[in-house]
Amino acid sequence: MAKRYLLDFEKPLVELEKQIEQIKELARDSEVDVSQQLLQLETLAARRREEIFKSLTPAQKIQVARHPQRPSTLDFVQMFCDDWIELHGDRNGGDDMALVGGIGSINNRPVLILGHQKGRDTKENVVRNFGMAKPGGYRKALRLMQHADRFSLPILTFIDTPGAYAGLTAEEQGQGEAIARNLREMFGLKVPIVATVIGEGGSGGALGIGVADRLLMFEHSVYTVASPEACASILWRDAAKAPEAASALKITGKDLLKLGIIDEVLPEPSGGNNWAPLDAGNTLKEAIEKHLNALLQMTKDELIEERYKKFRVLGKFIEANNIEEIYSEIPQKTE
């Protein structure tokens, strides 16, 4: 098993993790029974981890969402998708590796799956462009979604990107147009669409595959109009104020559910999805099945109408003296 990568605020666990690894090595190299000591240490580590993660700040949740060992789109595909066939190309000469898509089945139900894909290390991240899709990626996604619409396949999208690639070549190739076209076309698709923020949901890069009938988020995922670092640089000319920006942006699942932006917050294992990926996969699979079953009861016209209404109420201007007054104006959803 790969060595666990601990975040800054997990430092209280470092010594415990070292002791656990030492005991495991001792068990492998000798016949000494250390099961009792190992159980005690793992129980203590789990308890401390739970204490840390139940009170994370928005800035700390961003660190969890960006964790290099957090399950990715292709990880989840391997966990619960059968007969997976990845489809390539935008039919315009490109095949963006930062946004993957293909056809598979979940419990014998054919579906189209799209998602941003980050790498595990520097080499993979260069290939995947750190999960930042270029125009060709969004055009590939649209081609596959239109394919799904033609053959009546439900669409599942997994969002995990700091944002769409903002390089010169992306602008020259029409990044804004590609994302805008996806937004327009997704409103007219006649099949159910369930989007899930599995890690980082950043700006237009997330929206490019985020127009959905149901928008879900993992507990420690984030969904934001701009990265806190970018926001702090714009508002205060100081990227060091990113933690303050993270709090002000309301980027967590709890805040976004309260604001009516998302439809459900999915719980994560203690320590985040990277500590128990299979548990995270089971949680995601169950949520997808629940929402797909409900959406498949609706007619095509009802799907389109409800999807339009869902997004039409976003951005409503409300005058208020404080944020709690704004919350009171919004229909509340329960977790």
From Swiss-Prot:
GO cellular component, one term: acetyl-CoA carboxylase complex
Reactions catalysed according to its record: N(6)-carboxybiotinyl-L-lysyl-[protein] + acetyl-CoA = N(6)-biotinyl-L-lysyl-[protein] + malonyl-CoA
GO terms, biological process: fatty acid biosynthetic process; malonyl-CoA biosynthetic process
CoA carboxyltransferase C-terminal domain location: 40-294
Presence of the UniProt keyword Transferase in the record: yes
Pathway: Lipid metabolism; malonyl-CoA biosynthesis; malonyl-CoA from acetyl-CoA: step 1/1
Alphabetical list of Pfam families matching this protein: ACCA
Protein localization: Cytoplasm
EC number(s) from the headed UniProt entry: 2.1.3.15
Keyword Lipid biosynthesis set for record: yes
GO MF annotations in UniProt: acetyl-CoA carboxylase activity; ATP binding; carboxyl- or carbamoyltransferase activity
Subunit and interaction comment: Acetyl-CoA carboxylase is a heterohexamer composed of biotin carboxyl carrier protein (AccB), biotin carboxylase (AccC) and two subunits each of ACCase subunit alpha (AccA) and ACCase subunit beta (AccD).
Similarity remark: Belongs to the AccA family.
Function: Component of the acetyl coenzyme A carboxylase (ACC) complex. First, biotin carboxylase catalyzes the carboxylation of biotin on its carrier protein (BCCP) and then the CO(2) group is transferred by the carboxyltransferase to acetyl-CoA to form malonyl-CoA.
Designated name of the protein: Acetyl-coenzyme A carboxylase carboxyl transferase subunit alpha
Gene that this polypeptide is encoded by: accA
